[in-house]
Amino acid sequence: MSKIIGIDLGTTNSAVAVLEGTESKIIPNPEGNRTTPSVVAFKNGEIIVGDAAKRQAVTNPETIISIKSKMGTSEKVSANGKEYTPQEISAMILQNLKATAESYLGEKVEKAVITVPAYFNDAQRQATKDAGKIAGLEVERIVNEPTAAALAYGLDKTDKDEKILVFDLGGGTFDVSILELGDGVFDVLATAGNNKLGGDDFDQKIIDWMVAEFKKENGIDLGQDKMALQRLKDAAEKAKKDLSGVTTTQISLPFITAGAAGPLHLEMALTRAKFDELTHDLVEATRQPVRQALSDAGLSTSDIDEVLLVGGSTRIPAVVELVRHETNKEPNKSVNPDEVVAMGAAIQGGVITGDVKDVVLLDVTPLSLGIETMGGVFTKLIDRNTTIPTSKSQVFSTAADNQPAVDIHVLQGERPMAADNKTLGRFQLTDIPAAPRGIPQIEVTFDIDKNGIVSVKAKDLGTQKEQTIVIKSNSGLSDEEIDKMMKDAEANADADAKRKEEVDTRNEADALVFQTEKTLKDLEGKVEEAEVKKAEDAKEELKKALEGEDIDDIKAKSEALSEIAQNLAVKLYEQANAAQGEASEATDAQEGPKDANTFDGDFEESK
């Protein structure tokens, strides 16, 4: 069975891993980095992903960051003269990671396990699966990020019974999960979190502070300057990282804008104390989910054996301090917070292929599921933190006499009123025989698969008529749309490969021109003029071809020059060998014939 790669599709950074033997390994990208920025840019019709896209973000307004925060919504982003769904942009990142894995493994990769925040709702999970499909990946499993982290941590500890708390603060999302590990079973007991809280919010606090301070000093609002804002974002991210290791950092942005008197520079010092003050509300927002998860699991802090920190934002000292305070434990530092999720996803891939034995993963649904009933009430069928996959049925009836149809309004959330929860979908069961209200028996069944994706069935027990839907949110893509996007993605991949081939061909041709010029210089006066002219003409033909766009012409001219250059090189070597032979003969002639009584030998000096 072919390898199943593990992918951590993050808000700010992503990572890809693979199981080698019994060990999960992060695959470095072509730049040698173990994580890849989740950044996509468009330039002259070309798609740029990762480190290269992030490097040019300051000067390129067609750069898209933090697309994960839009997954599961109908929001689109405009770039490259068209509109893209979050799934399409995410697919470009996934394609990049897929190519990295294929280059490393030396084989095609078609299957992946992709992680999502534990608190992702159905729409966000479905969108992630669609992104994988567009990227040409069969998504074997969607795994919650904290669960994947626990897998990576606990794979070699399956003989122990432990309860662990995973505190996962990434670039754009926050989750807390409580898991029980024992006999190879990874059982998620509870999960809580916030899909709108992460490292990006910490960056934004620094940006807002810099904008306010600069306006106070210079009367200019940098918040209105798109290019300045991108420079501020980069500086804020760097300052945040610096303050994890030092207590003060200098922010220096020369020529940030221009005033009436000329260019203006931004020079500010940010202390850790000030940073803690600016971000106090964000750190505090992580406290309640920790308590909620413990409460839902029916545990106290003394029951927790280990605390794992996941996500780059858990390096912030104030966050670490809050975790210490809430759990009365020193967080475990044995896992790399940036890499552990992808590694866990690769392990789950190994479980699916059978390479990892005796490991069972029992995940949970993060939010309650149910339907709207009379009076706009939210009636739950499946409570949050129920182990998945699962199925639950309940019988309902009509609200009016002779009601011919019922509307099934499917919801996800925790609020008592339907209007306050997230709509997953609506469908109708029709042709209900006329009867007084309360008589028809309508059975509603919820199914949640191992990926946390929901399907709902309504059945009239009298007529046995039923209606089923797999939940598609308002951002859900039809199969036709996904197929079209897959073809577009493949076309882009082909175009990228063609572009790379063109660049390689041009580079090789340039090198050949340079090498030929060097060879001709070395052969000056040593070969016939006709041969030199033949090489000169072929070289000029290739240089002329390089000025055009016809790659086939460049290839043909390169081959012609290469053949001539090889013949010249052979002549150069022949001449060098001939000269060496002549020199050797001349030396022998100078030494004269040896005396018959003379012989060569070694001697030792006697002492």
From Swiss-Prot:
InterPro entries: ATPase_NBD (IPR043129), Chaperone_DnaK (IPR012725), Heat_shock_70_CS (IPR018181), HSP70_C_sf (IPR029048), HSP70_peptide-bd_sf (IPR029047), Hsp_70_fam (IPR013126). The keyword Cytoplasm does not apply. SUPFAM superfamilies: Actin-like ATPase domain, Heat shock protein 70kD (HSP70), C-terminal subdomain, Heat shock protein 70kD (HSP70), peptide-binding domain. GO terms for molecular function: ATP binding; ATP-dependent protein folding chaperone; unfolded protein binding. Signal peptide: none annotated. Pfam families: HSP70. It comes from the Bacteria. PROSITE patterns: HSP70_1, HSP70_2, HSP70_3. Induction: By stress conditions e.g. heat shock. Keywords: ATP-binding, Chaperone, Nucleotide-binding, Phosphoprotein, Stress response. Residues 577-607 are annotated as: Disordered. The modification Phosphothreonine is found at T173. Belongs to the heat shock protein 70 family. Acts as a chaperone. This is Chaperone protein DnaK. The lineage of its organism: Bacteria, Bacillati, Bacillota, Bacilli, Lactobacillales.
